Amino acid sequence: MFIIELTYTAPLDRIDAQMKAHMQYLRKQYASGRFLVSGRKIPRDGGIIIATGGTREEVEAIAKQDPFVTSGLAEVRVIEFRASQKAADIQQRIEAEPSRS
């Protein structure tokens, strides 16, 4: 499994201008089965994606296709880890998490 960390290197108005393209990219990766969960960091200085499948090199290549990265608006870091435990109620916990803008 992988943690993909995006860190913005541009002002939020430039990030917001690329948000539609970023969301299309995310939908494509969810449809492929690669991405499991994603969201913005708090404070809003980037985002986190949990991904699965493939090699580190493949995931790094996919992460570098993010429009925020290709437009020079964010840096990306990929961390590989082996998940050894999970909460039985992970879906309910994600859904119960309070929304913060």
PLM region spans:
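Conserved, structured core segments of small domains
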Residues: 1-101
